[in-house]
Regions:
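Short, well-ordered beta-strand elements
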Residues: 155-157, 165-183
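Short, surface-exposed loop or secondary-structure junction motifs
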Residues: 1-161
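Catalytic cores of secreted or luminal carbohydrate-active enzymes
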Residues: 186-187
Length: 187
């Protein structure tokens, strides 16, 4: 719900549809084409088929949320493939991209002179949030935080039925990564 509302705020303030605002102020600034990062599937033959584990509790309850006969194919070696579909919910998960496009996004965020965000706002973006009593929430602005071998990182995951993507940034180290799966979640 939060990202849907944020998308509406962006539309109200900018006067542009959410997809147009993101395309103009983020995607085009990175020099990416709509086939690299955007809100449409340009060539479904180049997209990976998404899968969900066939014999799993989550697959059992998945039928409560969608018509599996309409959106999923027959099981393949323990996995159920999703048929081509697009989630109509751009602010909360409608961006489709390649690994190279997300790497370009991460690289720009790590630059001192990012084309996407002013340095003072970037510092706020990766700053830990705290509750009113000072307890860390484990989140920044739209990023979750964690530690790996003593190094702090910020990450954001996305996906949907049959897909999972996570970008991770280590702000203090100046490095980042992207990982993509054509299966639901990491488990």
């Amino acid at each position: 719900l939060g990202y849907i509302l944020l998308g509406r705020v962006i539309e109200k303030v900018s006067g542009l549809p959410y997809e147009d605002y993101i395309s103009t102020h983020i995607i085009s600034r990175l020099g990416l084409g709509p086939d690299q990062l955007g809100f449409e599937i340009y060539n479904s033959r180049r997209n990976a088929t998404g899968y969900h584990k066939h014999k799993s509790f989550s697959n059992l309850i998945l039928g409560l949320f969608l018509d599996k006969s309409r959106f999923m194919g027959e099981p393949e070696e323990g996995w159920k493939p999703f048929k081509d579909y697009y989630i109509n919910g751009a602010p909360y998960g409608g961006l489709i991209g390649t690994a190279d496009a997300y790497v370009k996004y991460i690289q720009d965020l790590l630059k001192p002179d990012s084309s996407l965000i002013d340095p003072s706002y970037k510092n706020q973006m990766f700053e830990d949030n705290h509750t009113n009593n000072g307890k860390a929430t484990g989140m920044c602005l739209s990023w979750y935080t964690g530690m790996l071998k003593g190094h702090r990182y910020c990450h954001h995951a996305g996906g949907g039925g049959g897909y999972y993507c996570e970008i991770r940034i280590y702000p203090e180290r100046g490095i980042g990564s992207v990982i993509m799966f054509n299966r639901t979640g990491m488990t």
